[in-house]
Amino acid sequence: MKLKQNIEKEIIKINNIRIHQYTVLYTSNCTIDVYTKEGSNTYLRNELIFLERGINISVRLQKKKSTVNPFIAIRLSSDTLRRLKDALMIIYGISKVDACSCPNWSKGIIVADADDSVLDTFKSIDHNDDSRITSDLIYLISKIENNRKIIESIYISAVSFFSDKVRNTIEKDLSKRWTLAIIADEFNVSEITIRKRLESEYITFNQILMQSRMSKAALLLLDNSYQISQISNMIGFSSTSYFIRLFVKHFGITPKQFLTYFKSQ
């Protein structure tokens, strides 16, 4: 029974994750099963994974050590991503990438050929030093053989869409009671125009709003600096119980389960 409980503590399944920021993820203490609508892949411990912005995944994580965080992740802001893309285009002499002509490799998930030297380079990056993050990532990518796919994925992820502009507006103040009418006023266009432009990108305003709130909630839980009731208010929900129900519906687990799993001891 104790062995079963320990195994359950080391495993978690999280549904409906949308990657809003280009992410470099090091599986330092876990294996990850990643599920998309096309299928699934398993990524082993000590792998370096590049996740394109905009992909939707569900994951099953299994820790090696239950008291240690499962992975280390670097998430790039839109400004950092643009700077990185521009620098890589110059360094590698690439003028343009045609997203339509790119091979559909693992649906936006790329595993790097990462030896110990590459992994050590990743570990040495200071995630909080914005002044160095671009140069550090350029150096990291330069050490990876066959890095063309990574560079192309960065280029593709740096492309901005109208839905990104709507999301960025919402994320400036997630506590605000956003409506389609307010967004239309922000952009000085009609609600119908907003709706049609989002429909052309196969997404709705309500989907963007919910994705933004749930993603922010997950990041705030990972930060481990706030109570669940505080997070609920910060992302626009006055009722904590209602927030918890929505979190469970979205991710398939409770905020407490999420927090407990990712909390280092």
From Swiss-Prot:
Disruption phenotype: Loss of autoagglutination, hemagglutination and aggregative adherence to human epithelial HEp-2 cells, loss of aggregative adherence fimbria I expression. It comes from the Bacteria. Pfam families: HTH_18 (PF12833). Residues 181-202, 228-251 bind DNA. Keywords: Activator, DNA-binding, Plasmid, Transcription, Transcription regulation. Transcriptional activator of aggregative adherence fimbria I expression in enteroaggregative E.coli. Homodimer. This is Transcriptional activator AggR. It comes from Escherichia coli. The lineage of its organism: Bacteria, Pseudomonadati, Pseudomonadota, Gammaproteobacteria, Enterobacterales. The gene is aggR.
